[in-house]
């Protein structure tokens, strides 16, 4: 059965922006892509960069450390030097709150 973790108010993340959120032992990036919300691990898989502090264009985030890029929706690597996809989470918005579902 999935557990839900409440992350933030949807109004805290403007379209085209991200917010770093700590929930328990997770450090996450909450993205608003044209009104749709997506959540990934905040840490880049290549180095110490924070994806919530990266440059966002459409559904791609560029890490602020080595400029590797990830698809925000799928976690897939878009450009090197990153080689490992970033973890994504099933995301829901309920009563104006952004939540993730975990196993």
Where are these regions (language model features)?
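Short cysteine clusters
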Residues: 44, 63-66
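N-terminal pre-ligand scaffold of iron-sulfur
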Residues: 1-58, 72, 85-103
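Short cysteine/histidine-rich metal-coordination sites, predominantly Zn2+-binding motifs
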Residues: 58-64, 77-86
